[in-house]
C-alpha cells in the first residue's frame, strides 16, 4: 500500500507509538513524495503490530526503533484505507475492528464472532484466532472484503485442510454469508490456502496467498507464497 505521509509517519514513530514512548517531541517534517508502509509481526512477538517503511519497496527501514506500535493489538496485521479515508485492520484477541486516521493512534470496536463462525454450517471450522482475518476496501463496489482461513476437517492436525473464506460488508454491521474465496481448477483444485491478502492494481484484483499443501503433494508450490489474479 502506498502512502504520501511516510515522512510524517517516520517522525511520529519516534515519540508516539508504543508504551515505551520517548520524552519530548521532535520537529515534524513536511510531507514527502511518498513511500510504502509494511505492517507486520515478528517471531519474538507473534501477533503484535510493527511498522517498516520503504521508498522503493525493496529497501526497508524499521520504524519506532523496532518497538511495538500498539500493545493492545493482537492479530495478523493487514491495514486497508477505507471509505472515509481512515485506516482499518482486524484484531483477533479479542476479535475487534481497529481504526486510525493517522496510522499512529488506534481505537477499537468489538466484532461479532458469528461473522466467522457462521461458516461452521458449511463444514468449515474456525481455528484459534479465527484464521488470521485480512481485509480490503474496494472503491468500485463500496464494499469491504474480509477473508480468513478455516479448516474443512477438524480432525486434521496439519494445514492441509485449510481453505480461505470471505464475507462482504459496507458498514461493519451487516455481512454476507461466508463463502469460499478461491475456486481453482486442475492441479490447484484442492489447494490448502491461508493468509490471503487482496489488493487491486490498475483495475486488476491480486491475491497474495500461502499454498499450505505438503511439498510431497505439490512439489513445485507446496509451502510457498503465490500470487493469483
Question: Can you annotate each of these PLM segments?
Answer:
Residues 23-130, 136-195, 199-229:
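Beta-rich carbohydrate-recognition and catalytic domains
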Residues 15-17:
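N-terminal Sec signal peptide cleavage junction
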Residues 1-7:
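Sec-dependent signal peptide recognition
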Amino acid at each position: 500500500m502506498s502512502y504520501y505521509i511516510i515522512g510524517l509517519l517516520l517522525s511520529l514513530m519516534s515519540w508516539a507509538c508504543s508504551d515505551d514512548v520517548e520524552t519530548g517531541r521532535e520537529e515534524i517534517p513536511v510531507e514527502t513524495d511518498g513511500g510504502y508502509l509494511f505492517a507486520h509481526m515478528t517471531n519474538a512477538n507473534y501477533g503484535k503490530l510493527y511498522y517498516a517503511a520503504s521508498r522503493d519497496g525493496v529497501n526497508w527501514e524499521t520504524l519506532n526503533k523496532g518497538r511495538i506500535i500498539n500493545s493492545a493489538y493482537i492479530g495478523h496485521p493487514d491495514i486497508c484505507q477505507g471509505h472515509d479515508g481512515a485506516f482499518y485492520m482486524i484484531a483477533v484477541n479479542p476479535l475487534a475492528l481497529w481504526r486510525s486516521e493517522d496510522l499512529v493512534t488506534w481505537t477499537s470496536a468489538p466484532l461479532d464472532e458469528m461473522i466467522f463462525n457462521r461458516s461452521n454450517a458449511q463444514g468449515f471450522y474456525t481455528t484459534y484466532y479465527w484464521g488470521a482475518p485480512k481485509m480490503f476496501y474496494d472503491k468500485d463496489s463500496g464494499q469491504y472484503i474480509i477473508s480468513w482461513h478455516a479448516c474443512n476437517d477438524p480432525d486434521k492436525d496439519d494445514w492441509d485442510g485449510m481453505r480461505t473464506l470471505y464475507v462482504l460488508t459496507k458498514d461493519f454491521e451487516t455481512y454476507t454469508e461466508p463463502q469460499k474465496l478461491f475456486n481453482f481448477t486442475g492441479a490447484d483444485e484442492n489447494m490448502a490456502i491461508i493468509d490471503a491478502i487482496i489488493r487491486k492494481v490498475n483495475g486488476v484484483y491480486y491475491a497474495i496467498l500461502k499454498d499450505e499443501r505438503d511439498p510431497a503433494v505439490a512439489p513445485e508450490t507446496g509451502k510457498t507464497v503465490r500470487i493469483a489474479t
